[in-house]
Design a protein with these regions (language model features):
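Conserved helicase motor core of P-loop NTPases
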Residues: 87-88, 100-246, 255-259
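Residues at the starts of beta-strands that form the adenosine-phosphate
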Residues: 12, 93, 188, 332-333
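Short, charged/polar "capping" segments at the starts of alpha-helices
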Residues: 23-24, 104, 199-201, 342-346
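ASCE P-loop NTPase helicase motor core
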Residues: 1-156
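Structural motif
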Residues: 65-69, 190-192, 240, 307-309
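C-terminal accessory regions
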Residues: 147, 252-366
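Residue-level "contact hotspot" at macromolecular interaction interfaces
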Residues: 60, 232, 247-250, 296
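Structural beta-sheet core signal
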Residues: 15, 96, 191-193, 308, ...
């Protein structure tokens, strides 16, 4: 950006990311304002394959330097909105930043990988790690996992593997969470798990959230809860939005700051990265607790302390890129808890998932 401003002192710089937390982190690291792609382009929720539409002609990007972070999360629909909105006149430069080895987009298209593989786009690989401190074992373990090197995979110091029996994983995760909250603070401590809603899986984010809320933020007599189905939301709870809307997108994480009694139910005021958004009773169904989140939901985020259960029961879901994605969310401390053999097997499981497209072949043919 500094180089661009020297060459084009009057040029415009636009910073974007797929999620609110990723945009917030981009703002902090670049010391310049960044927004979500959706907000920058003026996209609104719609019953379309992408889940969004650009009303009218939508927002247009006035060229200049456009930088999009965490681009591995972007699928073909969102990428199409972005390119359509860009003024591709001389002097316009688009930089896509992302880690192609993380989990692919949950929507169709592996755009970042296709752009790299097509041979038509200039690619720069960044090799210096800025997230973890120099000498961090988190970075070392992440590299070993990403290259499939189980022989030299060692844990110590700030990246720890605690091997416990399967029936002790849940309690060990809870114990480590409470310990980590005391050391790093609640806002900086997350459990990241492979599974989401299964009530039969005690290590799903749904089940872990119930247990962690009971310990960290239990009910208090005389204090109002907002209730949606079996979920109770209280002041201080960390929550994740699960449905796109005009003011918040799927995957945005916030904290409940107020519960307001209504004639029917209660309204929540939630702080999403500094923006207070109200969720009336009819929107509560779109919220879930976020003491524990899935690996997919953690993409684009970084946390001081991350705890991840590794269970043999998840063996078909534990892939190299899933574990690599989870480990690289941790900035200061990474705790993996569970079955060591399941961990080693995940490093050798190179199944990537995702929905393929023909973009790479079409670009290569140009």
């Amino acid at each position: 950006m500094e180089t661009y401003e020297k060459i084009y002192p009057d040029g415009q710089i636009t910073l974007m990311a797929p999620t609110g937390l990723a945009a917030k982190r981009m703002t902090e690291s670049c010391e310049r304002p960044a927004k979500t792609i959706h907000k920058t382009l003026g996209l609104v929720p719609a019953d379309t394959p992408s889940g969004f539409e650009a009303p009218g002609d939508g927002q247009k990007l006035a060229g200049g330097l456009i930088i999009v972070d965490e681009f591995s999360m972007v699928g073909i629909h969102l990428a199409n909105f972005l390119i359509d909105a860009t003024d591709c006149t001389p002097g316009t430069h688009i930089v896509f930043v992302g880690d192609v080895d993380q989990l692919p987009s949950v929507t169709p298209g592996a755009i970042l990988r296709d752009l790299i593989d097509c041979g038509k786009v200039h690619v720069t690989r960044l090799t210096k790690n800025y997230r973890q401190a120099s000498g961090s074992m988190i970075a070392d373990v992440a590299v070993k996992v990403n290259t499939g090197n189980t022989r030299d995979l060692h844990f110590s110091k700030d990246c720890v593997f605690t091997e416990v029996p399967e029936n002790a994983i849940v309690q060990s995760v809870i114990d480590e969470f409470t310990k980590s909250v005391g050391e790093y603070g609640f806002d900086n401590t997350y459990v990241i798990t492979p599974t989401h809603k299964s009530d039969k899986d005690q290590l799903s984010s749904n089940m872990l959230n119930k247990k962690l809320q009971e310990i960290i933020n239990p009910p208090v007599e005389g204090r109002l809860d907002a209730v949606s189905g079996e979920r109770h939301f209280r002041v201080g709870d960390r929550v994740i939005n699960k449905k796109n809307a005009t003011d918040v997108i799927n995957g945005d994480i916030g904290k409940v700051v107020e519960v307001i009694s209504e004639d029917v139910g209660a309204t929540l005021k939630i702080d999403f990265s500094g923006e207070i958004i109200e969720f009336p009773p009819e929107r509560l169904k779109n919220l879930e607790l976020a003491y524990a989140i899935t690996v997919h939901s953690s993409q684009g985020c970084e946390f001081k302390s991350v705890i991840m259960p590794i269970s043999y029961s998840h063996r078909f879901m534990l892939t190299r890129n899933l574990v690599y994605t989870a480990i690289t969310r941790a900035k200061v401390k990474m705790n993996l808890i569970g079955n060591k053999n399941a961990m080693l097997a995940s490093v050798l499981n190179t199944k990537t998932g995702g929905v393929s497209d023909l973009l790479c072949a079409r670009l290569a043919a140009q």
